[in-house]
């Protein structure tokens, strides 16, 4: 079991520990439970979906990186598939606070990168801020997404964000988590570049059409790729680097162990991810950063 889970693990009920132990002890635990694993854990622990998501929050919170605020937030995104996905807030020293990733963004993006195409609920240990409410309003489940908080009855995103502004106001019909493939190609065969290209092809950028992807290679040779997730309100958009960092951190990778990185984006894109990607990666100690355009 990853060391970051030890403290939270000790506080779990014995029945839940028994049910989760084979899952969390796996060498490459991906910070998610498949639908089949969720079913097994519920049968052993006696918890239903809602109670299990709340019980998993301390483990998700243990994935937080908060060198600035020291305020850890965890989230569990529940997919229509039945899978549960961990999320936690992430902060980075040496770059503007705008590069911060909120727990809800993390859980949603984690699910998206794992291939989930629709969410039914998100459970979080603190009320979602306005930024996160707007970010989640881009999802194809929209205002029907159920939000669960400790000590409160479940509510929908529509109740947390009444009279919202979203994709439909801009006549956008392809929403975040809808399957897409933009069909860009590159002659370059480098696996890291191809991973970034694949991410760009599945990115969500209906407002600027500035599709982009980032792939990170760590010192142990693993590759983590992230896609751009644009938002109708623009500012809550999640850059592709943040998406890649989410996947790396949530699975237990050290974000300071990035050996090289590739950004793939359009050569004449209206917006570019290059400057902020380079600055953030340099702050994380990675100087081998390349931009490739289609």
Curated annotation (Swiss-Prot):
CDD domains: cytidine_deaminase (cd01283)
GO terms under cellular component: cytosol
Annotated catalysed reactions: cytidine + H2O + H(+) = uridine + NH4(+); 2'-deoxycytidine + H2O + H(+) = 2'-deoxyuridine + NH4(+)
Binding site for substrate: 89-91
Coiled-coil stretches noted in the UniProt entry, renumbered to this chain: none
CMP/dCMP-type deaminase domain sequence ranges: 48-168, 187-294
Cofactor note: Binds 1 zinc ion.
InterPro entries for this protein: APOBEC/CMP_deaminase_Zn-bd (IPR016192), CMP_dCMP_dom (IPR002125), Cyd/dCyd_deaminase_Zn-bd (IPR013171), Cyt/Deoxycyt_deaminase (IPR050202), Cyt_deam_dimer (IPR006263), Cytidine_deaminase-like (IPR016193), Cytidine_deaminase_bacteria (IPR020797)
Cofactor: Zn(2+)
Matches recorded under Pfam families: dCMP_cyt_deam_1 (PF00383), dCMP_cyt_deam_2 (PF08211)
Listed GO MF terms: cytidine deaminase activity; identical protein binding; zinc ion binding
Superkingdom, natural source: Bacteria
One Gene Ontology biological process: cytidine deamination
Family: Belongs to the cytidine and deoxycytidylate deaminase family.
Role according to the record: This enzyme scavenges exogenous and endogenous cytidine and 2'-deoxycytidine for UMP synthesis.
Protein name: Cytidine deaminase
